[in-house]
């Protein structure tokens, strides 16, 4: 059965940390493909503060061009209204039929997992893959993983990756201060930031 990773996010902007996480998940889990899913209108973020979805889609598409095993899906962008993870995974499950989905997310999401809508459907349609992030204690995360594994009769995959302390927030702030960012970004993304004059008035 084909194994497909699903990596969602606002990607505002996408940076080399995102590419590293997706690549490591692809290799470690022996996935056939990783789908990047730029968020449309995420329920947990202030929509007015997020770059236009079409531009974010363009940045992700450009960033993953060199990788044949990465692809992009515009379901959440095309979908009207709020974007919930369980709906996205249900859509992919129904679209691909005979596949095993792996939903890739960060440690912060594991900590707040009980606040997610229809969490049982997330486990029904996918394997949850959690990667560590700076500022989160590994032992506490593994304890939470065990608690959720028992509560939902599942087996969350924990990826102990290098902590790359790069964030989209940091990049936006550096652009606002007219500092160099090209070494944080995949080729071509900085050109799109310049093209649309992004992040210079936050």
Swiss-Prot record:
Query: Which EC number(s) does UniProt give?
Result: 2.7.7.18
What keywords tag this UniProt record? ATP-binding, NAD, Nucleotide-binding, Nucleotidyltransferase, Pyridine nucleotide biosynthesis, Transferase
GO biological process, any: NAD biosynthetic process
Entries under Pfam families matching the protein:
CTP_transf_like
Disulfide cysteine pairs (residue numbers): none
Q: Which GO terms describe its molecular function?
A: ATP binding; nicotinate-nucleotide adenylyltransferase activity
Catalytic reaction annotation: nicotinate beta-D-ribonucleotide + ATP + H(+) = deamido-NAD(+) + diphosphate
- Enzyme class label: transferase
The protein's annotated pathway: Cofactor biosynthesis; NAD(+) biosynthesis; deamido-NAD(+) from nicotinate D-ribonucleotide: step 1/1
The keyword Nucleotidyltransferase appears for this protein: yes
Q: Which InterPro entries match?
A: Cyt_trans-like (IPR004821), NadD/NMNAT (IPR005248), Rossmann-like_a/b/a_fold (IPR014729)
Q: What does this protein do?
A: Catalyzes the reversible adenylation of nicotinate mononucleotide (NaMN) to nicotinic acid adenine dinucleotide (NaAD).
Family, per entry: Belongs to the NadD family.
What is the name listed in the Swiss-Prot or TrEMBL entry for this protein?
A: Probable nicotinate-nucleotide adenylyltransferase
Organism listed in the record: Clostridium perfringens (strain SM101 / Type A)
Organism lineage reads as: Bacteria, Bacillati, Bacillota, Clostridia, Eubacteriales
- Gene giving rise to this polypeptide: nadD
């Amino acid at each position: 059965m084909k194994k497909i990773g699903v990596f969602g996010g606002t990607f505002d902007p996408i940076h080399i940390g995102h590419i590293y996480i997706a690549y490591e998940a692809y290799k470690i889990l022996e996935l056939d493909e990783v789908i990047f899913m730029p968020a449309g209108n995420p329920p947990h973020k202030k929509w007015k503060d997020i770059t236009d979805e079409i531009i974010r889609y363009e940045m992700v598409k450009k960033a993953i061009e060199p990788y044949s095993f990465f692809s992009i899906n515009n379901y959440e962008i095309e979908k009207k209204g709020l974007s919930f993870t369980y709906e996205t995974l249900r859509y992919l499950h129904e679209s691909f039929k005979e596949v095993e989905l792996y939903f890739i997310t960060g440690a912060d999401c594991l900590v707040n997992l009980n606040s997610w809508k229809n969490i049982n459907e997330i486990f029904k349609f996918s394997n949850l893959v959690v990667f560590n992030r700076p500022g989160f204690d590994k032992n506490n995360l593994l304890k939470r993983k065990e608690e959720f594994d028992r509560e939902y009769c599942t087996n969350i995959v924990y990826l102990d990756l290098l902590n790359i302390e790069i964030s989209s927030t940091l990049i936006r702030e550096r652009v606002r201060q007219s500092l160099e960012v090209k070494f944080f970004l995949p080729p071509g993304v900085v050109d799109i930031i310049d093209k649309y004059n992004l992040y210079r008035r936050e």
